[in-house]
Amino acid sequence: MRKSSRNSKLRTSNWLARRFNLATSSACEGATFEDLTNSTGVLVVAGPKSRELLEKISTDDFSNENFKWLTAQDVNVGYAPVNAMRVNFVGELGWELHHPIEYQNHIFDKIMEAGKDLGIKPFGIRAMNSLRLEKSYKLVGTELSIEYSPYESGLDRFVHPNKGSFIGLEALNKWREKGFDNKLITLEVHNTKDADVLGNNPIYKDNKVVGRATGGEFGFRLDKSIALAMVKPEHSNVGDKLQVDILGEMYEATVIEESPYDSEN
């Protein structure tokens, strides 16, 4: 099963459908293609006490030894079958709980009831956006898009050109040979007032545009205004000083190390 964000539903399903139709009949024998987006849901449980909470509502083992980071398992939560993934977008211990949509209210109620004495609180997409920026986590459609190569987006460790042929390998090799025009960086924006970087803000050096912000928000754990940006490689070194336009006003910004919150995980 291929899982992606709901915002990528059309892009992902169209891409898979095209590849499915282009494949030889023998390669697809016995296979079907179905979009399950509307029949599934996902809830995220994240925070230092997320393991403790899940072990209160499931008979499965969520220990670090049994449930490694970046792995998935089929578990139960109450009466619900759940595909749990030990990954999340907020930079804390946590799991994504993928489930049949008809079980969502049951799972949510179990989580909130079990989490009362742990101080559980619901959070939404704006809070998650702030948290992910403090970890320099990249979002599909902003930092990750067809405009940039995986190398420009900081995905080097996920690219293995020597593993054999794959879709895009030839283009990727040509891109590597000619060099890259952009590099993704993390910025601390100084002395912001009532607004932070939102996205598509121009980035300047000596009054010349050298890139654009892809996203930004105030980071409450860091107590700093944080942004991610694509800039010319010569302006991507840690400590480089740049300027960013926020609602027509210029603010100083400094290139900082990736993942400024809990960089050692």
Task: Give the predicted meaning of each segment.
Residues 1-3, 7-265:
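Conserved, structured C-terminal
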